[in-house]
Amino acid sequence: DRPWGTFEVLREQNNYKVKVLTVNPTEKLSLQYHRHRSEHWVVVEGTALVQIGDKEFTLNVNESTYVPAKQKHRLSNPSLEPLKVIEVQSGDYLGEDDIVRLEDVYRR
């Protein structure tokens, strides 16, 4: 569990990992980037507010986006319903410690 919700790893191989992220209502992940992996996000339930670089946009069910490695990004749930996102990570290192937090409301 995380302060913003939960994640479940569905499949993990050497060069990719597939997760389901559940972001609780009105919560957000840290503004962050990863050195070794890129991510694809597909919204399967709810509405996502996405920041990638200096751009911010909304994704609805069945919409997706790509987050390149080393690009700052944040996933938020602006609604009162849970947000579920399928995250596909790819890269040469997929450890949970490959994260640089630039801003974090939970002070991690």
Give the ranges of each region predicted by the language model.
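Double-stranded beta-helix
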Residues: 1-3, 74-108
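A short glycine-rich, His/Asp/Glu-containing loop-to-beta-strand
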Residues: 1-38, 93
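A structural signal for the main folded, soluble domain(s) of proteins
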Residues: 10-11, 47, 74
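A generic "binding-loop/recognition-motif" signal
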Residues: 25-27, 36-37, 55, 71-72, ...
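Short beta-strand segments
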Residues: 29, 55-57, 98
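Short hydrophobic/aromatic-rich beta-strand segments that constitute the beta-sheet cores
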Residues: 30, 50-52, 75
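Glycine- and acidic-residue-biased ligand/ion/polar-headgroup-sensing regions
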Residues: 35-54
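Short acidic-glycine-tyrosine-enriched beta hairpin
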Residues: 53-72
